[in-house]
Each structure stands twice: as C-alpha cells, then as structure tokens.
Design a protein with these regions (language model features):
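PLP-dependent aminotransferase-like
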Residues: 75-139
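Short acidic capping loops at alpha-helix termini that bridge into adjacent secondary structure
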Residues: 55-59, 83-84, 165, 172, ...
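Glycine/small-residue-rich loop that forms an oxyanion/phosphate-binding "nest" at active or ligand-binding sites
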Residues: 65-74, 170-174, 178-179, 188
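Short, conserved loop/helix-junction motifs that constitute active-site signature segments
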Residues: 78-80, 159-163, 188-192
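PLP-dependent aminotransferase class I/II
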Residues: 12-14, 102, 194-272, 278
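Structural scaffold positions in well-ordered secondary structure
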Residues: 4, 137, 171-173, 198, ...
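Active-site phosphate-binding strand-loop segment of PLP-dependent enzymes
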Residues: 116-179
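N-terminal small-domain helix-loop-helix segment of the aminotransferase-like
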Residues: 1-68
Length: 280
C-alpha cells in the first residue's frame, strides 16, 4: 500500500546509500563523534559547507526539517514579548501547531488562486509583515500543498523591505524538485542576518525515515546555534547515510524526472474527468 498523506518515497534509494548502509561498521556506534572538539558540528555540516559554500558555523543540522522548524519557532518566539508568527494562508497545518506549543500565536497572509495554480503576492507579504510586525515570517518555497514558490530575487526583495528584527524562515523541503540551482543560498544568508533557509533529506533524497534536516542561518546567532547544536554529536549511522545521499544527486534527479512524468500523466487523466480541477 502506498500512503500519500506525507509525500513519502516510493522508489529505491541510490546505490551509494545502499552501500553506505551495508558497509557501516556497527562498532562505530559504541563511541561518540569527536568532531565537536574541532569546533565543527558534524561530518555532514562540513560537507554541506563545501557543497553550498556557506561557512560551517552557519549551518544547522537536526532531526529532519521538522526539528529545524521547531527549534527556530520555539527559540525566537520564547524570547521577548512578541510571540507572533506570520504564515501562508494555505500551508502545512504543523506550522501553527508548533507556534502553539510555545505559547505563540499565528496570523496568515493570503495566497492567490490563478487559472491552474496558486501564487504569492510579494508586495502583500511585505505589507502584511510591516503592518503586523511578527517575530517570525514563514515562507514555504515550494509551498505545501499549493506548490507555488518564490524566486531568489523575490526572497531578497522581501528581506530588503521588512523589519530586520523579524526572523524569516524559508522552508525549502521541496525546492530540489523545481530547480537544481543552489547558488543563491550563500549570498542570501551572508547578506541577511535574520534569515534561515531549511532543507531536508526526506523529500528529494527520499529518506524520511533517516530523519536528517539541515539549514543555513545568517550571522550573529551564536546563542541559537548553541541551542540547536548537539555537544555529544549526531547519529553516526545517519551521518554516514546522509553523506552518501548528498553524493547521489544524479540518481535522485532521475527519480524526480520520473515523478514529473507521472505527475503530468496524473494531471492529464484527472483533468479529463468531469468535476475535477487540477492545479500545476
């Protein structure tokens, strides 16, 4: 049975991932990693720093994208009196749930339906953020479930025109499905201190059961990094598999192409049925 409620992976992992699992030495789990003594978080954050050209100290690592989200919301909403997060009108239900966990509240900005898709109105996002002045602004790109996304230029325009004390969290869990470009990430997080961009191995890399998420944050957040970091290190098995996944882009890009073919077939066939409207 294929479950469709959490966008899980119904294809095979890459050969490199399978090999990393088979070759993993279980005795490794008898010891903590010592990389924290070198001033690093993980062998994974070191590799991510090389891939994304972001300083290792500005890279976050956690138990899936979920932990990236929870850590950010819990930390920033619990500091000070402003406990409001601004989220998309149609979005993952979990966003407002996490805000409620730490006594926060949420308000929503609208998304707009076009002929066969939804879209952000960047000017309205800016206007809402300046008027409400939330502690956090959440942008999902692409947004789940509507699928609309923001360009790097649009993210930059939002960052340039909102209060600098509003922390912006960009959820890019599905970003690799719509673009191979990641060159915009480093310039954005190096320019804007109030920005977090979060990604995961759960969607494009098809490893939701591994529970590995990562993110990038602007400079000047040593206390938040200390809040997130694991002094005794991360799961060493997960680290080994994560490294293999990050070296398997060709495999997962081929899988994504198959998914897109299936999606277009689904769109065509379902769109031919009376009473159904299919969105891009």
């Amino acid at each position: 049975m294929n479950f469709l409620d959490r966008n899980e992976f119904n294809f095979q992992p890459s050969e490199k991932v399978v090999k990393a699992i088979k070759d993993f030495d279980p005795e490794t789990l008898c010891f903590y990693t010592r990389i924290y003594d070198e001033g690093k978080k993980s062998i994974v954050t070191v590799r991510l720093s090389e891939i994304y050209n972001v300083p290792e100290e500005q890279i976050l690592l956690g138990y899936g994208g979920e932990e990236m989200l929870k850590n950010a919301i819990h930390y920033f909403l619990m500091k000070g009196e402003n406990k409001t997060i601004l989220i998309p009108e149609f979005s993952w239900w979990y966003y407002n749930r996490v805000a409620g966990e730490c006594g926060g509240s949420f308000q929503m900005y609208p998304l707009y339906e076009t002929e066969d898709t939804f879209a952000y109105n960047v000017d309205e996002v800016i206007e809402y953020t300046n008027r409400i002045h939330p502690r956090m602004l959440l942008l999902a790109s692409p947004n789940n479930p509507t699928g609309n996304s923001l360009t790097s230029e649009e993210i930059g325009r939002i960052m340039e025109n909102i209060p600098s004390d509003t922390m912006v969290f960009v959820d890019e869990a599905y970003a690799s499905f719509i673009t191979t470009d990641t060159d915009y990430i480093a310039p954005l997080v190096m320019k804007y201190n109030n920005l977090i961009i979060a990604r995961t191995l759960s969607k494009f890399y098809g490893l939701p059961g591994l529970r590995v998420g990562f993110g990038f944050i602007g400079a000047g957040h040593d206390m938040f990094l200390s809040y997130c970091n694991k002094y005794l290190g991360y799961n060493r098995f997960s680290e080994a598999v994560a490294l293999a996944a990050l070296e398997s882009d060709e495999h997962y890009r081929n899988v994504a192409d198959k998914m897109e073919w299936d999606r277009q077939l689904f769109k065509k066939e379902l769109g031919n049925l009376p009473g159904f409207k299919v969105y891009k």
